[in-house]
């Protein structure tokens, strides 16, 4: 991804750093309307995820995370922008006439061929079971449950590493630093997700942030006591507590939020790094 800087003519262009224009011309049979209800609210209308709301209307692209076109070669026809994720997507034309979207692997260009199945070449964009991959392979779009489709390492620039195979399980190091076990029969895609430089973008202005459905973030210390535990006081005052808290009074900054006694606790060999 190429980062473009504009000539300074307004405060927006002075601070902005955007990626190169990747156009989107989605196929009608691969999109559907998505009713984005809630905007961070639960069924009772109470805010459970803050700083969300507004945003431009979106059409959802149907992404093939299963890669179940076995041993049928496909060709990359387009590389497109997807408003629902920070990774790009590419349209694949398969030999049997099927047309599907997949996540764009880093380095893939229009005209490249891909295939999924067992005993296929270890090549960027190919999907195959973990049992057929050599140790040290960089992978993304990894299944957790066999046949359910890829669920891990799908964000822009995400990549995991196959570090061991023993018995019925394979050991993976995930982008978060977590090391966990997954069935060797689960599938994954070779390579890294594209659009690696997405974290170098600078939107440059608040309006661009609003288009993405992200609202302003207000510090609790400048609120009233009725709105936040940190609020209140005369002028610029400290939070008045030994430790910071969430708007609902629970401990913040460091408290573990993972549920106890989860089924996958035995599969995690090392917790993610902060």
Curated annotation (Swiss-Prot):
<keyword id="KW-0689">Ribosomal protein</keyword>
<dbReference type="InterPro" id="IPR022669">
    <property type="entry name" value="Ribosomal_uL2_C"/>
</dbReference>
<keyword id="KW-0934">Plastid</keyword>
<dbReference type="InterPro" id="IPR022671">
    <property type="entry name" value="Ribosomal_uL2_CS"/>
</dbReference>
<dbReference type="GO" id="GO:0003735">
    <property type="term" value="F:structural constituent of ribosome"/>
</dbReference>
<dbReference type="Pfam" id="PF03947">
    <property type="entry name" value="Ribosomal_L2_C"/>
</dbReference>
<dbReference type="InterPro" id="IPR012340">
    <property type="entry name" value="NA-bd_OB-fold"/>
</dbReference>
<protein>
    <recommendedName>
        <fullName>Large ribosomal subunit protein uL2cz</fullName>
    </recommendedName>
</protein>
<dbReference type="InterPro" id="IPR022666">
    <property type="entry name" value="Ribosomal_uL2_RNA-bd_dom"/>
</dbReference>
<dbReference type="GO" id="GO:0009507">
    <property type="term" value="C:chloroplast"/>
</dbReference>
<dbReference type="InterPro" id="IPR008991">
    <property type="entry name" value="Translation_prot_SH3-like_sf"/>
</dbReference>
<comment type="similarity">
    <text>Belongs to the universal ribosomal protein uL2 family.</text>
</comment>
<dbReference type="GO" id="GO:0019843">
    <property type="term" value="F:rRNA binding"/>
</dbReference>
<comment type="subunit">
    <text>Part of the 50S ribosomal subunit.</text>
</comment>
<feature type="region of interest" description="Disordered">
    <location>
        <begin position="1"/>
        <end position="22"/>
    </location>
</feature>
<keyword id="KW-0150">Chloroplast</keyword>
<dbReference type="GO" id="GO:0005762">
    <property type="term" value="C:mitochondrial large ribosomal subunit"/>
</dbReference>
<dbReference type="GO" id="GO:0032543">
    <property type="term" value="P:mitochondrial translation"/>
</dbReference>
<dbReference type="GO" id="GO:0016740">
    <property type="term" value="F:transferase activity"/>
</dbReference>
<keyword id="KW-0687">Ribonucleoprotein</keyword>
<dbReference type="InterPro" id="IPR014726">
    <property type="entry name" value="Ribosomal_uL2_dom3"/>
</dbReference>
<feature type="region of interest" description="Disordered">
    <location>
        <begin position="224"/>
        <end position="274"/>
    </location>
</feature>
<dbReference type="Pfam" id="PF00181">
    <property type="entry name" value="Ribosomal_L2"/>
</dbReference>
<dbReference type="InterPro" id="IPR002171">
    <property type="entry name" value="Ribosomal_uL2"/>
</dbReference>
<dbReference type="GO" id="GO:0003723">
    <property type="term" value="F:RNA binding"/>
</dbReference>
<dbReference type="InterPro" id="IPR014722">
    <property type="entry name" value="Rib_uL2_dom2"/>
</dbReference>
<dbReference type="InterPro" id="IPR005880">
    <property type="entry name" value="Ribosomal_uL2_bac/org-type"/>
</dbReference>
């Amino acid at each position: 991804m190429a980062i473009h800087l504009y000539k300074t003519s307004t405060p927006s262009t002075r601070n902005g750093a955007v990626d190169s224009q990747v156009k989107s011309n989605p196929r009608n049979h691969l999109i559907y309307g998505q009713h984005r209800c809630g905007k961070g609210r639960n069924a009772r209308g109470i805010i459970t995820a803050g700083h969300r709301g507004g945003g431009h209307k979106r059409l959802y692209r149907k992404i093939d995370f299963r890669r179940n076109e076995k041993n049928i070669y496909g060709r990359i026809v387009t590389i497109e922008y997807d408003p629902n994720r920070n990774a790009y997507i590419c349209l694949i034309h398969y030999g049997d006439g099927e047309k599907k979207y997949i996540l764009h692997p880093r380095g893939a260009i229009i005209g490249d061929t891909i295939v999924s199945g067992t005993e296929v070449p270890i090549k960027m964009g190919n999907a195959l079971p973990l049992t057929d991959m050599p140790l040290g392979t960089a992978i993304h779009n990894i299944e957790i449950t066999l046949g359910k489709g890829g669920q891990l390492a799908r964000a822009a620039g995400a990549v995991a590493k196959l570090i061991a195979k023993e018995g019925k399980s394979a050991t993976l190091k995930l982008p978060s630093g977590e090391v966990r076990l997954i069935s060797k029969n689960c599938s994954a895609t070779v390579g890294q997700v594209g659009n690696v430089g997405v974290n170098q973008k600078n939107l440059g202005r608040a309006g661009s942030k609003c288009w993405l459905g992200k609202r302003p973030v207000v510090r609790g210390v400048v609120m009233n006591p009725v709105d936040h535990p940190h609020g209140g006081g005369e002028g610029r005052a400290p939070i008045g507590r030994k430790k910071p808290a969430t708007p609902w009074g629970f401990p913040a900054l460091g408290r573990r939020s993972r549920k106890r006694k989860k089924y996958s606790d035995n599969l995690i060999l090392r917790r993610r790094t902060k």
